[in-house]
Amino acid sequence: MVRAIVLVKSPKKLIAARLKRVNLIDESFPVSGQFDAVAMIQVESLAQIKDITTEIQKINGVERTETMIEVQ
């Protein structure tokens, strides 16, 4: 299993709710600070992480993302 956290910058207030609609995102919630939302992901491969982050970046209003992958 590969676990990752994707930080999302977006001026859209409901970005966390939109993230929940993305396939394979386990959880998402709004945060304060440099980013506006967090998406928690747990998948089988690194390639799936790339696919999910690409899908997130296509959401209208997403300005940038930063992905952190669990190191074991």
Where are these regions (language model features)?
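A compositional/biophysical signature of low hydrophobicity enriched in polar/charged and small residues
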Residues: 1-72
